[in-house]
Amino acid sequence: MNKFDIENLDLYYGENQALKAINLPIPVRQVTALIGPSGCGKSTLLRCLNRMNDLIEGVKITGKLAMDGEDIYGNVDVADLRIKVGMVFQKPNPFPMSIYENVAYGLRAQGIKDKKHIDEVVERSLRGAALWDEVKDRLKSHAFGLSGGQQQRLCIARTIAMEPDVILMDEPTSALDPIATHKIEELMEELKKNYTIVIVTHSMQQARRISDRTAFFLMGELVEHNDTQVIFSEPSDDRTRGYVNGDFG
């Protein structure tokens, strides 16, 4: 069963075509890794999944991108879409407020005022992001006092507090040390039990470790996609083989 079905998707920044006839199914409750050299279109595609590209002037998109069978570029509420499809960015970006308020922020923005309910969601979300035990005694402390890895997990907690269906991750560990990276990767194994995850990564080792499916992009084209084990051991295209073997990047 697929969470997203992408069919003949083209994207232009003005006259420049950044994505060319992309056809890609993204299965539900699995980790799909988007790989390829810089500028290949993988982050552009990621941002199509919650219409973040709408914020860029001069963008034009054609083709179909459906979530649960509904075209997300049709008559949909974009604000609701971005709740259902949360995003974690490359650099941790906690809000300039307490740990607690970071997680509660989205709930308050929706008009939720019940403190008991907010408390429950904050704890559940921090537990879901494997952060509760590290911060439960300092929830009122400023989020900027956390380490980089903790800040990134806080951003994940802030995302899952909104009860999304999908979590998009744009190189979420590129700014983290190996220990913090390992914790995020372990967390992803747990998160995929409840969420569909799509991750952009430059690390072949990371894609191999954490993803169920991998899609390889080159110069705006989707070269191939398959089970991750197949992409790394028996790719069908010589360009994929060259990339995963480190011949270019």
UniProtKB/Swiss-Prot annotation:
Keyword Membrane: yes
Chief location category: membrane
Its EC number(s): 7.3.2.1
Membrane topology: Peripheral membrane protein
Subcellular locations according to the entry: Cell inner membrane
Function recorded in the entry: Part of the ABC transporter complex PstSACB involved in phosphate import. Responsible for energy coupling to the transport system.
Protein known as: Phosphate import ATP-binding protein PstB 2
Gene: pstB2
